[in-house]
């Protein structure tokens, strides 16, 4: 697996993709990118605004373009948005252009980690747990489909998880 130079992190909201990705990039001396942050940078607006104005479909179009662009780079760690795997094109980019690491977490951990985060448009509802359960049903099989490595993130620090990823990848 070490012949692929890019590492792409996939997984649900609250799995720790951005935090773990930063640690991983630093430890491996790679460039770190976050697809959501890149969308915000390109649009000059936050994700919630993009959802409000363009809807989820507009956001997903932007996300696909950003991930297509970023996965063409070499020597990066990319934290993807939780829903990015819904796109067959994105799954293909990720699988073909790097090592895909699925950061797995429980619904309980997701709720705990995201409950105060107002930047997550899909969770601004009365019952976010129900939304997370529904998303898990449809997305978890897609994460598993493209994963080269699966790492559980519950009850571990980001640094510990980053070290586990490095060990599993043989870097």
From Swiss-Prot:
Which reactions fall under this protein's catalytic activity? shikimate + ATP = 3-phosphoshikimate + ADP + H(+)
Enumerate the GO terms in the molecular function aspect.
ATP binding; magnesium ion binding; shikimate kinase activity
The primary gene name is: aroK
Which species is this record about? Answer: Shewanella amazonensis (strain ATCC BAA-1098 / SB2B)
Q: What is its EC number?
A: 2.7.1.71
UniProt lists the family membership as follows: Belongs to the shikimate kinase family.
| Source organism superkingdom | Bacteria
Cofactor list = Mg(2+)
Enzyme class, spelled out: transferase
One of this protein's GO BP terms? amino acid biosynthetic process
Give the NCBIfam families listed for this entry: PRK05057.1
What this protein is called in its record is: Shikimate kinase
The answer to keyword Cytoplasm applying to this record is yes
Cofactor binding annotation: Binds 1 Mg(2+) ion per subunit.
Give a short account of what the protein does.
Answer: Catalyzes the specific phosphorylation of the 3-hydroxyl group of shikimic acid using ATP as a cosubstrate.
**Which pathway does UniProt place it in?**
Metabolic intermediate biosynthesis; chorismate biosynthesis; chorismate from D-erythrose 4-phosphate and phosphoenolpyruvate: step 5/7
Query: For this UniProt entry, which segments traverse the membrane?
Result: none
Name the GO cellular-component terms: cytosol
Subunit (UniProt): Monomer.
Q: Which residues bind ATP?
A: 14-19, 120, 156
Binding positions for substrate?
Answer: 36, 60, 82, 139
Primary location recorded for the protein, binned into one broad class: cytoplasm
Intracellular or extracellular location(s): Cytoplasm
Q: Which UniProt key words apply to this protein? A: Amino-acid biosynthesis, Aromatic amino acid biosynthesis, ATP-binding, Cytoplasm, Kinase, Magnesium, Metal-binding, Nucleotide-binding, Transferase
Q: Which residues bind Mg(2+)?
A: 18
């Amino acid at each position: 697996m070490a012949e692929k130079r890019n590492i792409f992190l996939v997984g649900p909201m609250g799995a720790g993709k951005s935090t773990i990705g930063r640690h991983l990039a630093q430890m491996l001396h790679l460039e770190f990118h976050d697809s959501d942050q890149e969308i915000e940078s390109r649009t000059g607006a936050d994700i919630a605004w993009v959802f409000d104005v363009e809807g989820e479909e507009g956001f997903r179009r932007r996300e696909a373009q950003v991930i297509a662009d970023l996965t063409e780079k070499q020597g990066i760690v990319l934290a993807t948005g939780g829903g990015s795997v819904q796109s067959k094109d994105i799954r293909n980019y990720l699988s073909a252009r790097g090592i895909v690491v699925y950061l797995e977490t429980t619904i309980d951990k997701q709720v705990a980690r995201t409950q105060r985060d107002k930047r997550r448009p899909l969770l601004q509802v009365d019952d976010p747990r129900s939304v997370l359960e529904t998303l898990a049903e449809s997305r978890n099989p897609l994460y598993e489909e493209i994963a080269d490595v699966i790492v559980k993130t519950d009850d571990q620090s980001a640094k510990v998880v980053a070290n586990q990823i490095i060990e599993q990848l043989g870097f």
